[in-house]
């Protein structure tokens, strides 16, 4: 429960900040051009019975704007006079146009009002990333310093990769570290350079691998190589009863050779698949009975040991942490140096996110969509300011990009119509705008339902 509350608090804080500043971008340009803003709210305020839905509100003297906080913490809004938006205030639109309304302003001014929120979110993301660079710098393990190399699945090996290859880069430049961006770059690469046996080898690819498939397949396309060497043993487990010690190396499981901890976990995964089909307790015990070949570090002797794995198929040891032994790169930045570094980092995040959107239109892409639960789970389970701000910056980029998509009801939908008006002189009617917003809003609701339904299905283990 504590973890849930910590993540929920971080999620609400981040979304509140992003929405407040996003709507503040619209508000700033509206005020700049003399457009009246009727309401500026953090959170939504749908009325309940006779209650107006506001936890707090005030209207300064000589101001036409009511400021407030609603009770539904899912965003916020800025209600601009004379604008057809999701509030669908048709009564206001029936009145004669006024000089202080959105609809009477030149198209270029209306365009700035509409892109104001997106502009603020992009600038905010780049600013946060810059301040992260200034406060914490960058810490990572370069792929070229991962001296054990990588472990590849059969698909990767068919393309020319080999276990223990050290990833260097593509035709676009060097890899930085092992992360989602590395998968994206490999999927788009025509050439991947690796260090194999001390020599540089180039592997030719088609530049169109399915990144989502590379990540989701079991075992994955590529992962850091982890030797099957014992680092520590949990007391009371099968491993402790076998007297396994630090430095012991596992060579085989149930007659199948394993040259890495990666292959060991893959073999356990196959047992789990068989356990699903086990119908009796005898079947379960038979599958849990494991024959393990071990070389003991202390004596150099190799033994074949038999044990019964735990009901959840645990042997009970932690492998040697190769990542802890690798050289870590730590880059630090001065205040002014942090801005170009933060902008570069933010741009890489944005380009990676945009490049991954093509997978939304695939079956696996739809299944990978996540709603509020998935987003909330991305925050750390304990309070960590570094991760909080990094996640907030990432969400700011997502909010900005999703809002600029040319979908009616989003900022990008208005921008599309405004650009058409500026180029052709044609201004869509209010009736057309209302219908377009209905369609766009329906699409957004459908997307939210699918994303949050996926969260529910994952929670019950269906997906």
Model-found features: residue ranges?
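Hydrophobic membrane-targeting alpha-helices
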Residues: 127-135, 400, 404, 448-455
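Functional transmembrane alpha-helices
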Residues: 2, 96-105, 217-252, 257, ...
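Terminal peptide-recognition signature
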Residues: 22-25, 69, 156, 164-167, ...
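PDZ/PDZ-like peptide-tail recognition elements
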Residues: 114-147, 180-234, 291-293, 304-327
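Membrane-interfacial segments
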Residues: 28-29, 33, 37, 41, ...
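Internal alpha-helical transmembrane segments
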Residues: 10, 14, 76, 80-87, ...
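Small-residue-rich helix-interface/hinge motifs
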Residues: 3-93, 402-424
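Conserved PDZ fold ligand-binding element
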Residues: 147, 153-179, 241-265, 346, ...
């Amino acid at each position: 429960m504590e973890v849930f509350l910590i993540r929920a608090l971080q999620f609400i804080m981040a979304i509140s900040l992003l929405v407040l500043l996003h709507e503040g971008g619209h508000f700033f340009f509206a005020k700049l051009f003399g457009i009246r803003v009727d309401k500026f709210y953090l959170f939504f305020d749908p009325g309940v019975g006779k209650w107006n839905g506001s936890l707090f509100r005030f209207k300064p003297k000589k101001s036409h704007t009511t400021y407030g906080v609603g009770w539904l913490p899912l965003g916020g809004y800025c209600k601009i006079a004379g604008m057809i938006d999701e509030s669908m205030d048709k009564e206001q639109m029936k009145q004669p146009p006024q000089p202080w309304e959105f609809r009477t302003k030149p198209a270029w001014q209306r365009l700035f009002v509409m892109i104001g929120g997106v502009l603020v979110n992009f600038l905010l993301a780049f600013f946060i990333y810059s301040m992260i660079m200034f406060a914490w710098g960058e810490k990572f393990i370069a792929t070229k310093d991962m001296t054990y190399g990588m472990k590849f699945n059969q698909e990767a090996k068919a393309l020319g990769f080999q276990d223990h290859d050290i990833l260097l880069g593509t035709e676009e430049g060097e890899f930085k570290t092992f992360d989602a961006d590395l998968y994206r770059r490999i999927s788009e690469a025509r050439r991947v350079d690796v260090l194999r046996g001390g020599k540089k080898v180039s592997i030719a690819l088609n530049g169109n691998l399915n990144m989502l498939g590379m990540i989701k397949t079991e075992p994955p396309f590529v992962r850091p190589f982890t030797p099957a060497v014992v680092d520590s043993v949990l007391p009371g487990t099968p491993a402790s009863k076998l007297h396994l010690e630090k430095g012991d190396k596992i060579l085989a499981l149930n007659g199948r050779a394993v040259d890495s901890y990666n292959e060991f976990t893959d073999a356990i995964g196959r047992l789990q698949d068989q356990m699903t089909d086990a119908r009796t307790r005898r079947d379960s015990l038979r599958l849990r009975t494991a024959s393990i070949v071990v070389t003991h570090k202390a004596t150099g002797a190799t033994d074949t040991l038999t044990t019964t794995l735990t009901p959840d198929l645990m042997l009970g040891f932690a492998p040697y942490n190769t990542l802890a032994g690798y050289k870590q790169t730590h880059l630090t930045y001065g205040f002014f140096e942090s801005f170009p570094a933060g902008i570069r980092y933010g741009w890489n995040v944005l380009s990676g996110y945009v490049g991954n959107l093509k997978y939304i239109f695939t079956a696996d892409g739809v299944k990978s969509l996540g709603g509020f639960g998935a987003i909330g789970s991305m925050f750390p389970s304990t309070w960590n300011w570094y991760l909080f701000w990094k996640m907030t910056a990432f969400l700011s980029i997502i909010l900005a990009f999703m809002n600029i998509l040319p979908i009616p009801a989003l900022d990008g939908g208005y921008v599309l119509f405004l650009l058409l008006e500026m180029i052709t002189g044609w201004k869509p009617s209010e009736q057309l705008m209302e219908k377009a917003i209905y369609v766009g809003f329906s699409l957004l609701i459908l997307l939210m339902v699918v994303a949050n339904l996926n969260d529910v299905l994952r929670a019950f283990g269906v997906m």
